[in-house]
From Swiss-Prot:
Bias-annotated ranges (Low complexity): 383-432
Classification via InterPro entries: GLI-like, Znf-C2H2_ZIC1-5/GLI1-3-like, Znf_C2H2_sf, Znf_C2H2_type, Znf_ZIC
Keywords carried by this UniProt record: Activator, Cytoplasm, Developmental protein, Differentiation, DNA-binding, Metal-binding, Neurogenesis, Nucleus, Repeat, Transcription, Transcription regulation, Zinc, Zinc-finger
Protein name as catalogued: Zinc finger protein ZIC 1
Length: 444
């Protein structure tokens, strides 16, 4: 399979190894050698990713043939380490000498080369400095925390596969003397923004790095305020045992205080209970009542995203109808098709048909069939008490609902002409107050 890589990429040291081009020294001098390792990088050319069977025989040879002759020629007037010249005797081979030499997975890959694009593995370069067994030096270091003996699935015969890591490429150990800690620090800082590109990087920190910054749960202490009957004498002494979870508190109250079926009196002895010793008819009613004191709500809404919890299963059953849209309670009045989700809403609605007005205003003699109407009426009293002292008719809020008499313009003009300016202004003010009061009564 052939891969046409397209344009020239001298910055990452990729060259057209298989091409038969020849370059003069003048052409080489014009190139900007600082962009890459190989100054002859005209383009990526054709990469043969799957070597043939006859190519596997040369697996013992060098996997990456250096282009040092051109490198040395291009660096003619520059200062460079003397070991660079050791590569001048290497032959100019094709792309297959650069890429994979074996289909099997090698285990000689160094751990520091697992996250680079072109990383030389152990024994890849033999040099005069005795680094034949050294690992490739990574120009852009990634996460290199794995053990050296652990084989990476991206290593093929000591060479890193042309992968999709976030790091760019690796240099041989012999080139390591050219770099400096300052340049490596700069490269690491510049590569920090490419973290999202690296699809082969393992999550070394795990979930701990995230949970470290989560808010720690506040430890709550739940106190039992049950008072035993034999300790009701002054001063009263409550249980005062503390618990860290609601389950422990509820279990303690149920087992130690409420008791089993042998208990005949189902009385709540919680501290400052408003029932004041009034018994329940059944044990389950006492258990449900104790949830008012403990705050237990063991019935959560099963619908996702709701998050509401309830102390009684009956309340949960009614609440679920808001999600399902079920309205099983139909109005019993003939000809009315209104339906309701619970019986209490239906009972409030029935007052419309029976003309019952059980909701009385405590400030006046008005009564209404629905509590919402009473709440609207109470706003009339609130607004009148907050404002300036208006006329008695406007402050009462329950005057006659008869609309005011419509006055013709001629009559109004005659009345205005017969009054003095001051009395005329007072007359208009009183009329306006009466209209406002009556309109408020209409909206109630």
């Amino acid at each position: 399979m052939l891969l046409d890589a397209g344009p020239q990429y001298p910055a990452i040291g990729v060259t057209t190894f298989g091409s038969s081009r020849h370059h003069s020294a003048a052409d080489v001098t014009d190139r900007e050698v600082g962009l890459g390792i190989n100054p002859f990088a005209d383009g990526m050319g054709a990469f043969k990713l799957n070597p043939g069977g006859h190519e596997l025989a040369s697996a013992g040879q060098t996997a990456f043939t250096s282009q040092a002759p051109g490198y040395a020629a291009a660096l003619g007037h520059h200062h460079h380490p003397p070991h660079v010249g050791s590569y001048s005797s290497a032959a100019f081979n094709s792309t297959r000498d650069f890429l994979f030499r074996n289909r099997g997975f090698g285990e000689a890959a160094a751990a520091s080369a697992q996250h680079s694009l072109f990383a030389s593995a152990a024994g890849g370069f033999g040099g005069p400095h005795g680094h034949g067994d050294a690992a490739g030096h990574i120009l852009f270091p990634g996460l290199h925390e794995q053990a050296a003996g652990h084989a990476s699935p991206n290593v093929v015969n000591g060479q890193m596969r042309l992968g999709f890591s976030g790091d760019m490429y690796g240099r041989a150990e012999q080139y390591g003397q050219v770099t400096s800690p300052r340049s490596e620090h700069y490269a690491s800082s510049q590569l920090h923004g490419y973290g999202h590109m690296n699809m082969n990087m393992a999550a070394h920190h795990g979930a701990g790095a995230f949970f470290r910054y989560m808010r720690q749960p506040i430890k709550q202490e739940l106190i039992c305020k049950w008072i035993e009957p034999e300790q009701l004498a002054n001063p009263k002494k409550s249980c005062n045992k503390t618990f860290s979870t609601m389950h422990e508190l509820v279990t303690h109250v149920t087992v130690e205080h409420v008791g089993g079926p042998e208990q005949s009196n189902h009385i709540c002895f919680w501290e400052e209970c408003p029932r004041e010793g009034k018994p329940f008819k059944a044990k389950y009613k006492l258990v449900n009542h104790i949830r008012v004191h403990t705050g237990e709500k063991p019935f959560p809404c099963p619908f996702p995203g709701c998050g509401k919890v309830f102390a009684r299963s009956e309340n949960l059953k009614i609440h679920k109808r808001t999600h399902t849209g079920e309205k099983p309670f139909k109005c019993e009045f003939e000809g009315c098709d209104r339906r309701f989700a619970n019986s209490s809403d239906r009972k409030k609605h029935m007052h419309v048909h029976t003309s019952d007005k059980p909701y009385l205003c405590k400030m006046c003699d008005k009564s209404y069939t629905h509590p919402s109407s009473l709440r609207k009426h109470m706003k009339v009293h609130e607004s009148s008490s907050q404002g300036s002292q208006p006329s008695p008719a406007a402050s009462s809020g329950y005057e006659s609902s008869t609309p005011p008499t419509i006055v013709s313009p001629s009559t109004e003009n005659q009345t205005a002409s017969s009054l003095s300016p001051s009395s005329s202004a007072g007359h208009h003010t009183a009329s306006h107050s009466t209209l406002t009061s009556n309109f408020n009564e209409w909206y109630v």
